[in-house]
Amino acid sequence: MSSQNAKSIGGILETSTVPLVIQPQIVNDPAQNNITLPITLCAVCGDTSNGNHYGVPTCFGCSGFFRRTVRNKLVHGCWNGDGNCVIDKANRNRCKSCRIKKCFKKGMNKNAVQPERTSHSYTVEYVELPSFREYSKGLLPTHSDRLRFQHEHAQHEIDTSSVLVHLKNALQWVQQFSLFAVLSDVEKSQIILTQWPHLLCLALFENSEKIFIDEKFAQLAEKFKSLELSAQDYFLLKGIIIFTETKDGTDLKFDRQLDICIGLLNQLHLESSKSKSGRLLFLLGELKSYSTRQLESLLDLKACEIVISFL
């Protein structure tokens, strides 16, 4: 196939809203000769379609991704930060932001997604407090903990040493988190190695550390501060951060753990502010799209030593 033809086909896959049907296959069957079976491709990633889902022919992977995103009202940050990632069979798991954008572009209907069925008859209020206590037991900072830390650093200019203290505390928190503790050693190492920078950002925001990394970091810090988040909010946001899919293309996924954390966050604000959990998830997506290279460069080998000690 010429490069010009290949480019044309790539353009059709990216922009067309009409289901793409490739050349029919000829199946030689002893009972029936020359039966033609047209193969319809997924409108989102180009994989083989398994039928119409939410109004558009898609594969099971893209339809399931669309359903989870709509049900949980998830907001994702772009993997590259420009909103123009290629979504195909090989790269569909890399950028959730561009993938859901393409789902909508191809005409998938969010109103066709049914609410998740449940056989439980108890109310959300009944589940909320016991569930949160179960996962957060012993991990929420007390008022005295915060005062002690503030006192220890009150007389000193904020420098990398205080940031490293927060990093160590954040990783200790992760190791004691019940949803993390049950994972395999490989899964634990993967999370610590890939998620520590953004986890550290949340720890710095939570403790209102006045440290300037770059302009974007300062903007994010101000946004988190303006929401006046509780310790419970930060607890669940840290849980969501560590279980969110990473940029490195790893096959490790933590959908169950992620769903639990998001569900608890939604329950936390069910009565007080139904829109707050949505704003928090949107802001968390913005944090995930933030490049932490400057922060990592600032901490250099000292951070590496701390991270490695937790593997």
Swiss-Prot record:
Top-level taxon of the source organism: Eukaryota
Keywords attached to this entry: DNA-binding, Metal-binding, Nucleus, Receptor, Transcription, Transcription regulation, Zinc, Zinc-finger
GO MF term list: nuclear receptor activity; RNA polymerase II cis-regulatory region sequence-specific DNA binding; zinc ion binding
UniProt subcellular location: Nucleus
Cellular component per GO, a single term: nucleus
Family matches, as SMART domains: ZnF_C4
InterPro entries listed in its UniProt record: NHR-like_dom_sf, Nucl_hrmn_rcpt_lig-bd, Nuclear_hormone_rcpt_NR2, Nuclear_hrmn_rcpt, Znf_hrmn_rcpt, Znf_NHR/GATA
GO biological process assignments: neuron differentiation; positive regulation of transcription by RNA polymerase II
Keyword Transcription recorded: yes
PROSITE patterns reported in the protein's UniProt record: NR_LBD (PS51843), NUCLEAR_REC_DBD_1 (PS00031), NUCLEAR_REC_DBD_2 (PS51030)
Coiled coil stretches, renumbered: none
Annotated DNA-binding residue span(s): 39-115
Residue span, NR LBD domain: 116-311
Zinc-finger keyword on record: yes
CDD domains assigned to the protein according to its UniProt record, in alphabetical order: NR_DBD_like
Major location (coarse): nucleus
One Pfam family this sequence matches: zf-C4
Signal peptide interval: none
Functional note: Orphan nuclear receptor.
PANTHER family, sorted: NUCLEAR HORMONE RECEPTOR
Family per record: Belongs to the nuclear hormone receptor family.
Name the UniProt record assigns to this protein: Nuclear hormone receptor family member nhr-111
Gene name for this UniProt entry: nhr-111
